[in-house]
Amino acid sequence: MKKSKYFCLSFVLFFNLFSLPVKPDAIFEMGKDVFLNKAMCGSCHALSDAETVGQIGPNLNEIKPDIRRVINAVTKGIGVMPPFEGVLSTQEIEAVAHYVSISAAE
């Protein structure tokens, strides 16, 4: 009985590893589209994956922001960066945060 419990647990854990966010996924691609086109983040920010070299805002490759930091900055604005709350949907903000946090971490 114990062996079957451990086998089932191992099976579940093994397959959960493959469900972690890995690019390209739909949210990642949506976030990249928001970054490049709708919010035009690359105008101000450098990000290697997006091939952008903006120099007004911080270089995202260097600061490697986590998803919460990106959501907060995009939603409320920070420094000279305007808030995008009301401009982007919650889903778009979460998608761009997902994209930036994964791309900058590489």
Language-model-detected regions and their locations in the chain:
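Gly/Gly-Pro-rich "capping" loops immediately C-terminal to redox-active cysteine motifs
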Residues: 28, 32-36, 42-78, 87
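Functionally constrained cores in energy, signaling, and assembly domains
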Residues: 5, 16, 49-50, 96-97, ...
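C-terminal capping alpha-helices of c-type cytochrome domains
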Residues: 87-106
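Short linear sequence motifs
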Residues: 7-11, 28, 77, 92
